[in-house]
């Protein structure tokens, strides 16, 4: 059995349709379990959009996220901040949201109830403000 067997079934990242053509706003839709074994595609998708001014990560299909996944999102957030961009989260489901609450990460990211709400907020709150839908 190859080391990659089953990983694609457990986790997927796709650039959501309608995210814009300028690459200024990129929507990454996550599905499945984000952990040490599956984090590679997320890192690759984030690296594929270096000119993005805003990345919205749609977590509505994310069923699990461990510390490796959280750290990848935190690193991407810092990289975007260095260039004046931002990374926002949308649609956290209860098990994933609980992990973000326990670690305090929910206070670091802008978190929206769903993707529609996140995309409607073009300006967004100032850093440090929480957004929960």
Segments predicted by a language model, with ranges:
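Intrinsically disordered, low-complexity regulatory regions of eukaryotic regulatory proteins
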Residues: 2-7, 56, 64, 127
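Amphipathic alpha-helical interaction surfaces in cytosolic regulatory modules
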Residues: 36-109
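Short, charged, intrinsically disordered terminal tails
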Residues: 7-10, 113-133
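Residues that form or immediately flank small-molecule/cofactor binding pockets and catalytic motifs
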Residues: 18, 94, 116
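Alpha-helix termini
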Residues: 21, 80, 125-129
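STAS-typified acidic loop motif
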Residues: 2-44
